[in-house]
């Protein structure tokens, strides 16, 4: 045979690209690792982060001190390193907040650097939101491409409850960032089997525990199981790595717990939220299993698991889709669940298809030993199989985290606020980005059917959510429904008809899915938030907005945590930093059409979707949220929201304040926080947040007074159920009988240095 007659080398197997999409969902010719970064990817990521930063930083100071309970602890930590370490409510270290202090540390450092202001307190929270979006983008992009990462990051950024909490000073912002970081580290460990990633994940979980105790460990079981089953290392090494990760959790969380438990109780602040001055009691009781069972001694509304969740909404599988929860988090939840099931199913079946083809290649290789083309194709299939295994593991990780958190939140009977749902936001966003990218890259009719169905379901659910606020942007729900129908039909067109049509339909589908959340988020950004119970978006029909059913007054009135008749700007409104007026309220708790002109931060705001004079819910009206009805206001006013401190009251407390350990004492942390933030002097919070903690006892309080450590007692405020083992109610009675009353405007003080 002449050289010209000899057959040439076999042609290489066709490369797998996004354009050469397989025709079935289980085709083993799946696109593998994402292509190298295109020129548009980095600018797109920068744009996403800049838009997120602008959204979260815009008019940030309009919320004043937000949750004064935590702001007072931040102020204390900026004045005292001991208060910083323990998370004390005041710089004199009488009692701590009812959480570990990690979430307070970034804010306290910011206040030390920039001085006390709303901006200094809230900027770290906003930056945490930007960081969470960036980390989520990177975690999703690694296996599913830049488009998936951008979609996931964007979905997280505009989730209403995420925008709410990344502009607020509750611990949930830091917890969300740490959980995204923990999952990202576990995914890196699943990709390369390196121990350092699991150790870093353990550190994130440990710091999460120091942020919000056991909630940080909700997703530990599914992540550990997935790693134990899917890690690319030997089984024995997997368990060794998991043990090291567990050790990292213990060390990163345990150092603080050990110091607190070993520290002499007499020389540290009382552990707020506990009944016996113990952090472990707080962890496993009030903040732990009590949240599941409803048996929370010392909590708002008393202990005892009430059927159906008592004052915190009905429990059950539909809880997060209900009127007062749905608009916070559930916009993309149906899509995430559909894409989770589809992604796992597709990748599992593709695994079997790849295994079958590999077996066939091995048989051919045996017959044609040394044939280069067969060996090359077999190696390509091994690469595809490995990539599909990695993608499958990522679906299991994000899906496991979502299902574990969703199930817990749906059925827990204890305290449950709408803003807790931020924990679900990154898991939902990741699954939407991953699932959409997986189906888009595979192409074919089955993928088109699933994508079209997902868009249609999302548009339909968005219509339902928007219809719960019928007078707010009434055109939006119909627009979303129409665009969703067009997008679904466009995705069903044969791809050969026009690829441009398919791309346009996909873009339209993204717009449809995000239109509702974006509108809710813009409304949230344009509405000042304050108090202990806050929600995102406009008022809704049938929403409770908080534990209305569990307290006198029933329905909730007022959307920003203010009490009807005692709203921000009134006598019992929320204290704002210097230069900021409160948000006006009409008698009865109705929010005025326009806030007072002196309110800072209103200049240059985003256009508020549907902005108009609107009521925030009179007592008894469906949809009122954030504050209690009139009958509840008398009992709960100082418990959930702070007080407006007049200039005269501020001057009274500041006079000779340096001669005392505490300028004043008040029942409940919110009441004390208002005066502390106004004067920047320590104010003792008797009974902690609920006014029900036995700190201090009457005997101890008498000692403080006899030693000249407290100047004034602030009348008002409200102890929790039963007055907290008699402590706060006994102190109030003793003070009223013993000392001279001083009235300043609407506020009443007792001078503890002058007996009546």
Predicted features by range, described:
Residues 445-545:
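Transmembrane helical bundles and short interhelical boundary loops of multi-pass, membrane-embedded
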Residues 1-297, 303-362, 368-372, 378-447, ...:
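Membrane-integral, polyisoprenol-dependent glycosyltransferases
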Residues 218, 236, 673-675, 694-695, ...:
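Extracytoplasmic/secreted cell-surface and envelope-processing proteins
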Residues 274-278, 282, 287-315, 320, ...:
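Disordered, low-complexity segments in secreted/periplasmic proteins that are enriched in proline
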């Amino acid at each position: 045979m002449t050289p010209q007659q000899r057959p040439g080398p076999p042609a290489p197997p066709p490369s797998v690209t996004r354009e050469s999409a397989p025709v079935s969902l289980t085709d083993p010719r799946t696109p593998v690792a994402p292509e190298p970064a295109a020129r548009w990817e980095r600018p797109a990521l920068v744009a996403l982060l800049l838009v997120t930063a602008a959204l979260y930083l815009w008019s940030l100071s309009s919320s004043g001190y937000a949750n004064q309970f935590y702001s007072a602890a931040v102020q204390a930590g900026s004045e005292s390193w001991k208060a910083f370490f323990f998370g004390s409510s005041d710089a004199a270290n009488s009692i701590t907040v009812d959480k570990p202090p990690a979430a307070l540390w970034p804010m306290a450092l910011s206040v030390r650097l920039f001085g006390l202001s709303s901006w200094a307190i809230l900027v770290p929270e906003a930056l945490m939101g930007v960081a969470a979006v960036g980390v989520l983008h990177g975690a999703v992009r690694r296996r599913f491409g830049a488009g998936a990462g951008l979609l996931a990051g964007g979905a997280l950024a505009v989730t209403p409850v995420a925008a709410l909490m990344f502009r607020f000073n509750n611990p949930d912002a830091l917890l969300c960032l740490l959980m995204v970081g923990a999952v990202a580290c576990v995914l890196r460990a699943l990709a390369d089997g390196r121990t350092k990633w699991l150790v870093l994940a353990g550190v994130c979980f440990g710091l999460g525990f120091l942020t919000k105790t056991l909630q940080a460990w909700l997703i530990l079981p599914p992540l550990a199981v997935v790693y134990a089953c899917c890690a690319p290392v030997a089984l024995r090494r997997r368990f060794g790595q998991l043990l090291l990760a567990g050790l990292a959790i213990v060390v990163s969380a345990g150092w603080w717990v050990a110091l607190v438990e070993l520290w002499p109780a007499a020389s540290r602040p009382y552990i707020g939220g506990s009944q016996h001055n113990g952090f472990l009691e707080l962890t496993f009781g009030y903040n732990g299993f009590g949240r599941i069972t409803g048996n929370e001694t010392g909590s708002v509304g008393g202990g005892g698991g009430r059927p159906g969740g008592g004052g915190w909404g009905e429990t059950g599988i539909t809880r997060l889709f209900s009127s007062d929860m749905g608009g916070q988090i559930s916009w993309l939840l149906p899509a995430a669940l559909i894409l989770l099931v589809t992604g796992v199913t597709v990748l599992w079946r593709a695994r079997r298809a790849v295994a079958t083809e590999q077996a066939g290649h091995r048989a051919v290789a045996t017959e044609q030993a040394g044939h280069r083309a067969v060996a090359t194709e077999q190696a390509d299939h091994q690469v595809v199989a490995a990539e599909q295994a990695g993608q499958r593991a990522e679906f299991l990780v994000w899906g496991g985290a979502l299902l574990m958190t969703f199930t817990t939140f749906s059925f827990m009977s204890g305290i449950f606020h709408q803003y807790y749902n931020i924990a679900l936001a990154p898991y939902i966003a990741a699954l939407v980005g991953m699932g959409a990218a997986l189906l888009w890259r595979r192409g074919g009719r089955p993928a088109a059917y699933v994508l079209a169905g997902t868009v249609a379901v999302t548009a339909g659910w968005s219509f339902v959510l928007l219809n719960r606020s019928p007078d707010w942007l009434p055109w939006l729900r119909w627009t979303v429904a129409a665009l969703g129908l067009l997008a679904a039909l466009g995705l069903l067109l044969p791809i050969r008809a026009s690829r441009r049509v398919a791309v346009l339909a996909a873009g339209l589908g993204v717009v449809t899915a995000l239109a509702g959340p974006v509108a809710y988020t813009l409304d949230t950004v344009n509405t000042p938030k304050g108090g202990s119970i806050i929600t995102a978006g406009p008022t809704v029909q049938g929403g409770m907005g908080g534990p209305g059913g569990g307290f006198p007054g029933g329905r909730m009135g007022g959307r920003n945590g203010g009490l009807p008749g005692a709203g921000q700007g009134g006598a019992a409104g929320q204290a704002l930093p210097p230069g900021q007026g409160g948000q006006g309220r009409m008698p009865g708790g109705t929010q005025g059409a326009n806030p007072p002109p002196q309110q800072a931060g209103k200049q240059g705001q985003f256009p508020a979707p549907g902005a108009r004079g609107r009521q925030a819910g009179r007592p008894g009206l469906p949809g009122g949220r954030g504050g209690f009805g009139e009958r509840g206001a008398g009992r709960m006013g100082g418990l959930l929201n702070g007080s407006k401190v007049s200039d005269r009251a501020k001057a009274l407390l500041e006079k000779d304040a340096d001669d005392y350990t505490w300028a004043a004492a008040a029942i409940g942390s919110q009441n004390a926080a208002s005066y502390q933030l106004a004067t920047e002097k320590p104010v003792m919070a008797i009974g902690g947040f609920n006014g029900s903690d036995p700190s201090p006892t009457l005997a101890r309080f008498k000692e403080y007074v006899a030693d000249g450590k407290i100047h004034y007692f602030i009348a008002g405020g409200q102890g929790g159920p039963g007055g907290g083992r008699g402590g706060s109610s006994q102190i109030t009675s003793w003070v009223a009988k013993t000392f001279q009353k001083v009235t300043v405007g609407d506020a009443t003080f007792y001078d503890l240095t002058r007996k009546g």
